[in-house]
Amino acid sequence: MKSADRFSPVKMEDAFANSLPTTPSLEVPVLTVSPADTSLQTKNVVAQTKPEEKKPAKKRKSWGQELPVPKTNLPPRKRAKTEDEKEQRRIERVLRNRAAAQTSRERKRLEMEKLESEKIDMEQQNQFLLQRLAQMEAENNRLSQQVAQLSAEVRGSRHSTPTSSSPASVSPTLTPTLFKQEGDEVPLDRIPFPTPSVTDYSPTLKPSSLAESPDLTQHPAVSVGGLEGDESALTLFDLGASIKHEPTHDLTAPLSDDDFRRLFNGDSSLESDSSLLEDGFAFDVLDSGDLSAFPFDSMVDFDTEPVTLEDLEQTNGLSDSASCKAASLQPSHGASTSRCDGQGIAAGSA
């Protein structure tokens, strides 16, 4: 039944009809071709050809794989021809590459260790510099605060200082007690001037000069009235010393202007001394040897009568040995003659 159905004449006709070419339709054929259709077709063609042209990638062998022992012992410079020799060259190449890689890794390790040590040193140095920077910043801030504080104190002191300040309050040396004003002048009669002693102006009137020049041959003695002797002569200087102790003369009386002029302006005092010592006293200028012709206004009065040693002993109260020694003493060289003998020399030179 089934075979009969399969080969039935109706079905045979349908199959034959399907196999016959169909007649073309009456539609207008398309004369242009779309570029999109052609591009898609080319992409498909390229995609289909690529898998065929791609070669399988060479698989890398794992690291540390054990190499087989070479079967041949080919010299290094000889070219490998057989498969065993090529395998030997491959094994040698792998061993050389492994040794070079090990050397490179060791060199890199040393370089990394060196870089690590340098990095640690630089980090420590950087940390130290950061600490120093912090300290310097703190010090700078402290100094800035001090400067600001001192500036404020200076400005405050300038504002607090009075504008009108007298020189006496600033300097104690300019006080009115040291420098008086013009209206505070003291009259001269109220100023206590010290009265100088006669011994300050004439060293021959000092008692200490009686024991300083024992030499009798250097300066000859000048006697009053032209008298010379061992006991009857008395020098002008000794007269001044003897009169010093007389209570009748007022030694504390103030000196006159002429006395000061003769004391401080005696230009020829040394010359008169030398002329007196060389030529002696000129008594011929006196009227018959009268000493009253001298206009004495000093504190020393001369007497024309000769004075003996007995009178000196009674006046001064000296012993015999002291009186003899005082009579033979001479004034020292260059002694001042401004009072007792200066006027006599001046009169003699006139």
Curated annotation (Swiss-Prot):
Biased amino acid composition, Polar residues: 35-47, 196-211, 329-340
Self-association state and partner proteins as the record states: Homodimer.
Gene: hacA
Record region (Disordered): 1-118, 152-175, 194-218, 328-350
Domain bZIP: 87-150
Function comment: Transcriptional activator involved in the unfolded protein response (UPR) pathway. Recognizes and binds to the UPR element (UPRE) in the promoter of UPR-regulated genes. Increases the synthesis of endoplasmic reticulum-resident proteins required for protein folding as well as components of the secretory pathway.
Residue spans of biased composition, Low complexity class: 160-175
Residue segments, region Leucine-zipper: 143-150
Alphabetic keyword roster: Activator, DNA-binding, Nucleus, Transcription, Transcription regulation, Unfolded protein response
Location(s), subcellular: Nucleus
Basic and acidic residues biased stretches: 81-95, 104-118
A GO cellular component annotation in the UniProt record: nucleus
Name of protein: Transcriptional activator hacA
Region (Basic motif): 89-142
GO molecular function: DNA binding; DNA-binding transcription factor activity, RNA polymerase II-specific
GO aspect biological process, one term: response to unfolded protein
Family: Belongs to the bZIP family.
